[in-house]
A protein has these predicted regions:
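Conserved phosphate-binding elements of NTP-dependent enzyme cores
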Residues: 1-951
Length: 951
């Protein structure tokens, strides 16, 4: 068997006909600047070829359902293994997917609860046990010898009526006695019951004395009693004045509730047999949220304090104003009073109505005036009714602005039916178990005690569950719960979950290709991840990891540096070998940083800010423990902490959502906190995340940054355009006139292929240029509009050197390291890091007010350390303009250059949510309680930066 994967002539995207040899059964890290060609080699070449070869091994019938894969642009790849890609782009957004379902642990839990779960009555909570005839007989026969037992069949339990038919049937059946409400009656006499009272009626089947020779008779009596009552047997022991009720069913005999045979599907919230009927197994419902109807309680009704559709009371002649005037008159309040200062009962009436109480409404319209008397249904009730009744998508969308996901009123977020939630193992139902963090779940399973029979049944199930939970713990996800929605996971978390699943499968001889598995992981947990990767390698697999993390690079068996630059300046193998060999390579930027020859310097002086601060009081969203924290304004603040410590809850849920509501007037429900002070010192908040800059190929860097407007205006000002009467609109590919109508300005035509994936082919009319012939005849400096869109930022900067407005925008794109990106490159082809840097460039090109707060969540994702240096420069420029920059980050290069650190923890999940430290990086490095401080201390001392320093 080959000991290397040999790639010859790889030319995919920007790769320059490169040859690479990758050792098998090794941990191989590919690194290089953003856009250098790492993903082109790892995913678009190696993985794509592995997938294509697997597809070719299938039958043509199977292939028609899977679609056809193009051969990558490569001469040959030898020594390939079956390839599995674990990237960050395949995170499930389905609200039904949870950590438990994605890892398949929930399937084992469903089996466990179905096989050894103890059912209880969902109404009274009494344990329900089902017993066979033999088990019932054995229990009765175990009573002391010579004990007299009366076997009864409970045919009526707590039901009103005279029940004469029951007595008649018993007589016809040959039975002599019945017990009614505790008293024995002979069936030969007339029994009269009060039909308005509840009664208990039991037929006396037999009277038995406990002796070994009476077992046959006892068995017959139990079988008859069970048949008469539908599975119930009552053993009355007069001498002991006690009764024992036995049941062959899962049913509560007190409440009359029965449960069917327990099966795994009953515990699935994706099955109609188990899902809560109210929410359909989602655990949440979309409901009108009063906080979104009244986003600013400091405003009055007359000031537009109520923003819901149809209920703005600013206009005098509106119907809503007619109701408000009537309410104010009846309940004696002033419409000019801030809504938050109105009495509680008045706010309740505004939201939920007057019930049956009528209002006196005075109307005055073009058709006449008069008085009406009618109840007021309330704004919340009105909006919910309109949402249910409307046929208009626009109205539905408008009303959804006032709605929020709330826990289901019946299952309270547990997703399952009440009878399913009443089944417990070790005292917990399946929902309560999955709501525990993984560490607590493991502890629960370790102390779980089962009967000998149940332990035998559960042994193999528990072994599988434990091993999978341990794998999740080994990749640093011990703070997650199995009930956590997969849609709320970060890219790094979802990737590590799939990594844990792969370890659990114990495959060998596989080629795994991973995309930055360290994203979102604190340095403390990095060693766990590396141990996991080594374990996967030691099983006999080859790992190709696209990664920028220095710890991972140093742990690699083989390191491949792609570059030297990005885009057209990349696509070559700069250096390949052990980490030590790459560190000695003068040409490798990665090597320069590994050796310590290049470093991101620590600032000589920290900014102190403008004297003002944002003060968050009593933040308690998710795992935050009523934290109070100050964020100084005019500085760069880094929020740090181990994974799951509460960073995103504090910054994204509490701070961002509160400020975006107050400053940008967005309708969002902020995370729980007592209040935020200091908002008056800011004028806007901007979240610069890694979401795409557009959802369609029509969106591109030129359109997003506003650059294209200036370019179109420039083309419209040329002599050719003026002679033809062309305006700037002529050079838009989004509107009729200048665009190619054959493809509507897309440049591509979509061919639907039924079973096969849709195929995009260049438009035959415009040859992919998007514009019609007449528009392309207009030139500026010898280039038409399509040729300009095909330029890289770097080429365009030289081309538009004499156009200051365009040049300045292009320069900001160069400053953020996007010189290799084409102006017209579809936004759908840009990585998350590239999209984020385009947003940063757009902000840099705007005139600063010095009162903006920028929020960034792990902006170093996908960035090489050289790109991180450039990012830090941009963040410094934004801060130096007087703005405030707030960054959630694990990258020590960013943390060490921050002016202020807020460290959360100490652990993740329930053990987190507290402020461990606030202050400068130097003070943080001296804080022994801070995990971040421990690693920051090494970074500031320079130990971590240069283990391969060449003397």
């Amino acid at each position: 068997m080959r000991d290397h994967i040999v790639i010859k002539g790889a030319r995919e995207n920007n790769l320059k006909n490169i040859d690479v040899e990758i050792p098998r059964d090794a941990l191989v890290v590919m690194t290089g600047l953003s856009g250098s060609g790492k993903s082109s080699l790892a995913f678009d070449t190696i993985f794509a070829e592995g997938q294509r070869r697997y597809m070719e091994s299938l039958s043509s019938y199977a292939r028609q359902f899977l679609g056809q894969m193009d051969k990558p642009d490569v001469d040959s790849i030898d020594g390939m293994s079956p390839a599995i890609s674990i990237d960050q782009k395949t995170t499930s957004k389905n609200p039904r997917s949870t950590v438990g379902t994605v890892t398949e642990i929930y399937d084992y839990l469903r089996l466990l609860w179905a096989r050894v779960g103890v059912p209880h009555c969902p109404k009274c909570g009494k344990e329900i046990r089902r017993q066979t005839v033999d088990q019932i007989v054995d229990q009765i026969a175990a009573l002391p010898q010579a004990t007299r037992v009366q076997i009864l069949a409970p045919v009526i339990r707590a039901r009103k009526g005279e029940h004469q038919k029951v007595f008649d049937d018993a007589r016809r059946g040959g039975y002599v006695r019945v017990r009614v409400d505790g008293s024995i009656y002979d069936l030969t006499e007339t029994i009269t019951l009060d039909k308005n009272r509840k009664h208990n009626i039991e037929i006396v089947v037999d009277r038995v004395v406990i002796r070994p020779d009476q077992n046959r008779r006892l068995t017959d009596a139990v079988e008859i009693a069970s048949a008469l009552s539908g599975g119930l047997v009552l053993a009355d022991i007069p001498e002991e004045k006690r009764e024992i009720l036995f049941s062959q069913n899962y049913a509560c005999d007190d409440c009359g509730i029965s449960i069917e045979e327990l099966t795994p599907r009953m515990f699935s919230f994706n099955s109609p047999y188990g899902a809560c009927p109210t929410c359909g197994g989602l655990g949440t419902r979309l409901r009108i949220d009063p906080a979104l109807i009244i986003p600013d309680p400091s405003k009055s009704i007359l000031d537009g304090g109520i923003t819901a559709s149809g209920w703005n009371g600013v206009k005098n002649e509106s119907i809503s104003r007619m109701y408000y005037d009537a309410l104010a008159e009846k309940y004696h309040f002033d419409l000019a009073t801030p809504i938050g200062d109105l009495p509680e009962h008045v706010r309740e009436i505004l939201l939920y109505g007057t019930g049956d109480e009528e209002l006196t409404l005075h109307y005055d319209t073009n058709r006449g005036s008069g008085v009406l008397r009618r109840p007021f249904e309330g704004i919340v009730c009105n909006l919910e009714r309109r949402y249910q009744e409307t046929q208009s998508d626009a109205m539905r969308a408008s009303l959804e602005d006032c709605m929020a996901e709330t826990a289901c009123p019946d299952c309270h977020g547990a997703r399952l039916r009440p009878e399913v939630l009443a089944v417990t193992v070790g005292g917990l139902n399946i929902s309560e178990f999955t709501a525990l963090p993984i560490t607590e779940e493991l502890a629960f399973l370790d102390r779980l005690t089962l009967s000998e029979k149940d332990a035998q049944i559960a042994d193999s199930i528990l072994r599988e569950v434990r091993s999978r939970l341990h794998f999740l713990q080994s990749v640093g996800l011990q703070y997650l719960t199995l009930a956590r929605s997969a849609a709320t996971l970060s890219g790094g978390e979802s990737q590590r979950i799939r990594l844990a699943t792969q370890i659990g499968s114990s495959l060998m001889g596989v080629l795994y290709i991973l995309d930055e598995p360290s994203i979102g992981l604190h340095q403390r947990d990095n060693e766990k991840l590396l141990a996991t990767l080594r374990e996967l390698r030691d099983l006999g697999n080859t790992l190709i990891v696209v990664e920028h993390d220095e710890d991972t690079m140093r742990a690699a068996d083989y390191l491949i540096d792609i570059g030297p630059g990005a885009g057209v300046h990349g696509g070559e193998v700069v250096c390949a070998g052990t980490p030590e060999e790459v560190a000695r390579c003068e040409r490798s930027i990665t090597g320069q940083y590994l050796s310590g020859k290049m470093k991101i310097p620590v600032p000589a002086q920290r900014r102190t800010g403008n004297g003002h601060a944002l003060v968050i009081r009593g933040a308690s969203e998710h795992n935050l423990k009523q934290v109070d924290v100050q964020i100084p304004l005019g500085v760069m603040t880094c929020v740090t902490g181990v994974s799951g410590s509460g960073k995103s809850s504090l910054v994204n849920e509490v701070l961002y959502k509160t400020l975006v509501g107050k400053l940008n007037h967005a309708k969002v429900r902020p995370g729980k906190c007592d209040g935020i002070d200091g908002v008056e010192y800011l004028d806007k908040i901007i979240n610069i995340d890694q979401s795409p800059i557009g959802r369609t190929p029509r969106s591109n860097p030129a359109t997003y940054t506003g650059l294209f407007d200036d370019i179109r205006s420039l083309f419209a000002s040329t002599q050719d355009a003026k002679l033809r009467g062309y305006s700037a609109g002529r050079f838009s590919f989004n509107i009729r006139g200048g665009r190619c109508e054959a493809c509507s300005g897309d440049g591509l035509l979509k061919i639907e292929m039924n079973f096969l994936p849709d195929v995009y082919v260049p438009c035959e009319v415009c040859k992919g240029k998007r514009y019609n012939r007449e528009t392309l005849e207009v030139h500026y400096k010898g280039k038409n509009i399509a040729e300009v869109l095909d330029m890289t930022v770097e080429e365009a900067l030289a081309f538009f050197q004499n156009q200051p407005k365009i040049r300045d925008r292009l320069q900001t794109l160069m400053d953020v390291g996007l010189g290799y990106v084409k102006l017209g490159q579809p936004s759908t082809t840009l990585s998350g890091g590239e999209a984020q840097r385009i947003k940063l460039a757009t902000e840099l090109s705007k005139r600063s007010t010095g009162r903006t707060i920028y929020v960034l969540d792990e902006p170093t994702t996908g960035l090489h350390v050289a790109d991180v240096a450039r990012l830090i420069d941009i963040l410094n420029r934004l801060t130096d303009a007087g703005n405030t920059v707030l960054v959630i980050e694990h990258n020590l290069h960013v943390i060490k250059v921050a002016d202020h650190i807020i460290d959360l923890g100490p652990e993740g999940g329930d053990a987190g949510g507290s402020i461990v430290f606030t202050g400068t990086p130097e003070d943080c490095a001296r804080c022994a309680e801070s995990y971040t401080g421990q690693f920051l201390k090494k970074e500031l001392e320079g130990e971590r930066s240069s283990p391969f320093l060449i003397g």
